[in-house]
Amino acid sequence: MSEQNNTEMSFQIQRIYTKDISFEAPNAPAVFQKEWQPEVKLDLDTASNQLADGVFEVVLRVTVTATMGEETAFLCEVQQAGIFTIAGIDGTQMAHCLGAYCPNILFPYARECITNLVARGTFPQLNLAPVNFDALFMSYLQQQAGEEPTQEA
């Protein structure tokens, strides 16, 4: 075994928590009197920062906006965060871990939070589809390299 392979790769979730929540229904109660045919827009963003040697905070920001014509039915924003201990990887592997693997772990928590907030606003159930953070991360890398993202069939 070479010296390069002596560093053992490890990954541990220290904590998963909700960092920020916002729910707005600016046109309630008038919006409840209309036929429910919204256009739903989903925006995602991730950020990470190093807290200590091998300890990282990753924040997944999810914003869901439902509009009916020109009116906003609701706007829901959640920042789901996690603290992760990561050792034995660096460079592109670390970037992938922080930009795709950790957000994959955080997304179900954010989705549940959003679903609950929308239900508490008495809007019809909102089911967010799973997100392919690996594909989003690859697209981000291609944009950073100045390439056009490729579309998969």
UniProtKB/Swiss-Prot annotation:
Gene3D superfamilies referenced in this protein's UniProt entry, alphabetically: SecB-like
Protein localization: Cytoplasm
GO cellular component terms, A-Z: cytoplasm
Positions of disulphide bridges: none
SUPFAM superfamilies membership: SecB-like
MF terms in GO: unfolded protein binding
Similarity comment: Belongs to the SecB family.
The protein's name in its UniProt record: Protein-export protein SecB
Gene: secB
